[in-house]
């Protein structure tokens, strides 16, 4: 018989640096999950990812206090910041432009994120990434 699911916890954890401190500790502690067990397993699974890369993580907690987790690809904004060299996006979205990104770069990001995006094809995925870029204050240029 399958284990009964108690709930899901969604966190954004930096690769290779999961620690019992907030936000991980309190989120897992509320559900009675072994915090150190999660931290060790997460760090082991993400050792091949560049340290400090934010990874959206969905933790499934079962009634017997055991857990499983799935890490997804880094957020689109992480890739956009990496390409443009920005620390953060525009303060006034829509009125301020902080950098430029090409359609080719958007397509490359869409290819990386395709499995996590709610899109049927690469063009739709690229449009989703384009929306994130515009929200950050990036200008889309043809290349």
UniProtKB/Swiss-Prot annotation:
Complexes and interactors: Part of the ribosomal stalk of the 50S ribosomal subunit. Interacts with L10 and the large rRNA to form the base of the stalk. L10 forms an elongated spine to which L12 dimers bind in a sequential fashion forming a multimeric L10(L12)X complex.
Family named by the database record: Belongs to the universal ribosomal protein uL11 family.
PTM field: One or more lysine residues are methylated.
Gene encoding the protein: rplK
SMART domains for this protein: RL11
Functional note: Forms part of the ribosomal stalk which helps the ribosome interact with GTP-bound translation factors.
Any one cellular-component term (Gene Ontology): cytosolic large ribosomal subunit
Protein name in the entry: Large ribosomal subunit protein uL11
HAMAP family, per the entry: Ribosomal_uL11
GO terms assigned for molecular function: large ribosomal subunit rRNA binding; structural constituent of ribosome
PANTHER family in UniProt: 60S RIBOSOMAL PROTEIN L12, LARGE RIBOSOMAL SUBUNIT PROTEIN UL11M
């Amino acid at each position: 018989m399958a284990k009964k699911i108690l709930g899901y916890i969604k966190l954004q954890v930096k690769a290779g640096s999961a620690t019992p401190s907030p936000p991980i500790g309190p989120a897992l502690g509320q559900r009675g999950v072994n915090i150190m067990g999660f931290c060790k397993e997460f760090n082991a699974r993400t050792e091949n990812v560049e340290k400090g890369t934010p990874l959206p993580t969905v933790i499934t907690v079962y009634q017997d206090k055991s857990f499983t987790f799935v890490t997804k690809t880094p957020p689109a904004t992480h890739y956009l910041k990496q390409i443009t060299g920005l620390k953060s996006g525009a303060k006034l979205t829509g009125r301020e432009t902080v950098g430029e990104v090409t359609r080719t770069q958007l397509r490359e990001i869409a290819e990386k994120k395709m499995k996590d995006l709610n899109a049927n094809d690469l063009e739709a995925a690229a449009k989703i990434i384009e929306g994130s870029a515009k929200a950050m204050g990036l200008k889309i240029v043809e290349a």
